[in-house]
């Protein structure tokens, strides 16, 4: 039953927009037309609001303007972007921003909620997913321009700037990084992609999604069936607890598992939690006796490390360093590790 529920979620997100748009065209009701004009369906992606987090401000709304007098140019900077039907006001993003601030960063949360269909009518929002997905390109360009403007006006070097994106926000980061390269002919140093959205992107070519070449280092967390997993889009892929559903969430609550990637990142950034992980390639993740159709929803979970395990690693704040050369595909255990055994520090 749970597998069928998961299938329904994925297919509903990807397909229902077709019916809604067809109905809107066939029956041009004035109310529907007016709603669509104000919605993300019409590409309402002309602006972003940037919220500043540092030791002085806990979410100062800068709009799309710079505020160099409020920023310590010597500190590293992180841009955080949300995904579909989300916003900068969601507590998990605030927690992540504050975790970075506590570790000596300036954090910006990029709010593109209107283009992400956050304010859509209940029951209609999922039908607008593809519109939000299409808007990621324009939002990425706006984020890139803001980044370059920050560099020029506030004298912050690109090597001190990182991108973090969740779900569709991961692709926003990818498009932003591509545009930064076009604008200044330099490559972003680091992107953290938190369960990057698979629907509308998973099978795309490199130029139409976040891609390994967008930054010198890309780290990917996978926590749900909504996230890209088999297509290696980063230098380091960390799959938490099989990458389908997470222990803190009900089996049917796919959005919860999707958002747990933010929670894991926050715990690691803050230093409150470190995870043990073992190598886990695509071949190891798939049970050869399973039907191909079910492979999307099931995995071979490896055994938890013991005192005899030598081929394991410790995932901690080092994962977020630009110069960390640790690469590969790993299965991460969701609980905070109390005993590190013989696992290597990364």
Curated annotation (Swiss-Prot):
Give residue ranges for the propeptide.
27-37
Post-translational modification summary for this protein: Contains six disulfide bonds.
Q: Where is the active site?
A: 167, 195, 258
The EC class name is hydrolase
The entry annotates sugar attachment on 44, 72, 185
- Keywords, alphabetical: Allergen, Cytolysis, Disulfide bond, Glycoprotein, Hemolysis, Hydrolase, Lipid degradation, Lipid metabolism, Secreted, Signal
Residue span of the signal peptide, if any?
1-26
Q: Does the keyword Cell division apply?
A: no
Listed GO molecular functions? Answer: phospholipase A1 activity; serine hydrolase activity
Q: Name one GO cellular component term.
A: extracellular space
Subcellular localization, as worded in the UniProt entry: Secreted
Biological process terms from the Gene Ontology for this record are:
killing of cells of another organism; lipid catabolic process
The family database entries (Pfam families) matched by this protein are listed as: Lipase (PF00151)
Q: Which chemical reaction does it catalyze?
A: a 1,2-diacyl-sn-glycero-3-phosphocholine + H2O = a 2-acyl-sn-glycero-3-phosphocholine + a fatty acid + H(+)
The catalytic activity of this protein is classed by the Enzyme Commission as: 3.1.1.32
- Where does tissue-level expression of this protein occur? Expressed by the venom gland.
Q: Which family does it belong to?
A: Belongs to the AB hydrolase superfamily. Lipase family.
Biological role: Catalyzes the hydrolysis of phosphatidylcholine with phospholipase A1 activity. Induces hemolytic activity. Acts as an allergen.
The protein here is known as Phospholipase A1
């Amino acid at each position: 039953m749970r597998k069928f529920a998961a299938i329904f979620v994925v297919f509903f997100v990807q397909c229902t927009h077709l019916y809604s748009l067809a109905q809107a065209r066939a029956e041009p009701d004035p109310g529907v037309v007016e709603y669509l004009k104000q919605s993300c369906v019409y590409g309402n992606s002309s602006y972003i609001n940037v919220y500043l987090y540092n030791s002085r401000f806990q979410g100062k709304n800068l709009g799309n303007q710079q505020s160099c007098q409020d920023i310590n140019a010597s500190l590293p900077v992180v841009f955080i972007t949300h995904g579909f039907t989300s916003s900068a006001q969601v507590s998990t993003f605030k927690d992540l921003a504050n975790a970075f601030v506590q570790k000596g960063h300036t954090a910006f949360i990029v709010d593109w909620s209107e283009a992400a269909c956050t304010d859509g009518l209940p029951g209609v929002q999922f039908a607008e997913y593809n519109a939000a997905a299409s808007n990621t390109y324009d939002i990425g360009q706006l984020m890139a321009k803001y980044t370059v403007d920050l560099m020029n006006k506030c004298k912050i070097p690109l090597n001190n700037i990182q991108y973090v994106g969740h779900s569709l926000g991961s692709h926003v980061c990818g498009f932003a990084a591509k545009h930064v390269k076009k604008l200044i002919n330099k490559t972003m140093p680091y992107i953290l992609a938190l369960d990057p959205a698979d629907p509308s992107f998973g099978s795309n070519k490199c130029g139409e999604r976040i891609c390994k070449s967008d930054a010198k280092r890309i780290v990917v967390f996978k926590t749900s069936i909504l996230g890209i997993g088999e297509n290696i889009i980063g230098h380091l892929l960390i799959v938490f607890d099989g990458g389908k559903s997470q222990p803190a969430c009900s089996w049917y609550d796919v959005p919860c598992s999707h958002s747990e990637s933010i929670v894991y990142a926050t715990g690691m950034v803050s230093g409150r939690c470190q995870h043990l992980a073992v190598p886990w390639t695509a071949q190891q993740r798939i049970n050869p006796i399973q039907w191909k159709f079910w492979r999307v929803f099931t995995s071979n979970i490896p055994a938890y490390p013991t005192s005899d395990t030598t081929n394991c690693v410790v995932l901690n704040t080092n994962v977020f360093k630009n110069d960390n050369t640790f690469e590969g595909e790993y299965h991460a255990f969701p609980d905070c590790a109390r005993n590190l055994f013989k696992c290597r520090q990364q």
